[in-house]
Amino acid sequence: ADPAARASVSAVWGVDPDDLPGPGVPAVELLQSAGLPGGVRALLVHGSNVFVSAPNVQTVREALGRLDLLVVSDFFLSETAEAADIVLPVLQWAEEEGTMTNLEGRVLRRRRAVEAPAGARSELWIMA
């Protein structure tokens, strides 16, 4: 890790640079450690259906099955959400106001097109 970057971040947050976490691990390693001693015990899957999109899906299913807690935030009951201990319903793009940046780098305003179902929350609300 870059010491200058760590010093900058620690100054902004008012913490000792040594208290900042180190580099993370690749997603494949993270999933392989799920539910094992010293590994991840709980996981929030956000915006992904890993039971369909991850390589070696059977291994991923087994790994997530070892977790103490699996939380999935999604706007429909995906294969991954079906296996979750908790499913947090999120808004679809047409159900929220905001902005987006397209592939050209243009910032576009998005207006709500339809009302969201009761109980659904924005992903920002869930993360906060």
Residue ranges with predicted function:
Residues 1-128:
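Non-catalytic alpha/beta scaffold blocks inside enzyme catalytic domains
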